[in-house]
Curated annotation (Swiss-Prot):
Family: Belongs to the CWC21 family.
InterPro entries, per the entry: CWC21 (IPR051372), mRNA_splic_Cwf21_dom (IPR013170)
Biological source species: Eremothecium gossypii (strain ATCC 10895 / CBS 109.51 / FGSC 9923 / NRRL Y-1056) (Yeast)
GO cellular component terms attached to this protein's record: cytoplasm; Prp19 complex; U2-type spliceosomal complex
CWF21 domain mapped to chain residues: 62-103
Lineage: Eukaryota, Fungi, Dikarya, Ascomycota, Saccharomycotina
Protein's UniProt name: Pre-mRNA-splicing factor CWC21
SMART domains: cwf21
Biased composition (Polar residues): 12-35
GO terms classed as biological process: mRNA splicing, via spliceosome
């Protein structure tokens, strides 16, 4: 009832027939001659996936806009708890929103103008 030390000593009470099958999960691991090509292929897939995620700026822009709205919402909650007039709350929230949007635009402008050293050296090789 066991194969290479794997399996049950007896199938009794296990609700199984006790039949042991060869694991198909390690099919590629046993094929040593193609190991290096498989490794290169998998590394290429990981590199392509990370490049594709970096290229999608719409997700980053959405996350930035969402962060701004979360901070505005937190301010609104604090001001409402302090029993401040609704017009004053709107004014302060809009002021914070404009400030955060201008800071985000400045960060984006600086990020676009500046290329990190490791990116410059990677592009040269």
């Amino acid at each position: 009832m066991s194969y290479n030390g794997i399996g049950l000593k007896t199938a009794k009470g296990s609700s199984t027939s006790g039949h042991i099958q060869r694991s198909l999960a390690d099919n590629q691991a046993g094929n040593v001659k193609n190991f290096s090509s498989r490794k290169e292929e998998s590394q290429g897939r990981v590199a392509r996936a990370s490049r594709e995620r970096k290229l999608d700026g719409s997700m980053a822009a959405h996350a930035d806009r969402r962060e701004i709205e979360v901070r505005v919402s937190e301010l609104r909650d604090e001001l409402e708890d302090a029993d401040i007039d609704a017009e004053e709350i709107e004014r302060r929230c809009e002021q914070l929103r404009r400030q955060l949007q201008s800071e985000a635009a400045e960060r984006a402008r600086v990020a676009q103008a500046y290329t990190p050293r490791n990116a410059r050296s990677a592009g040269a090789t």
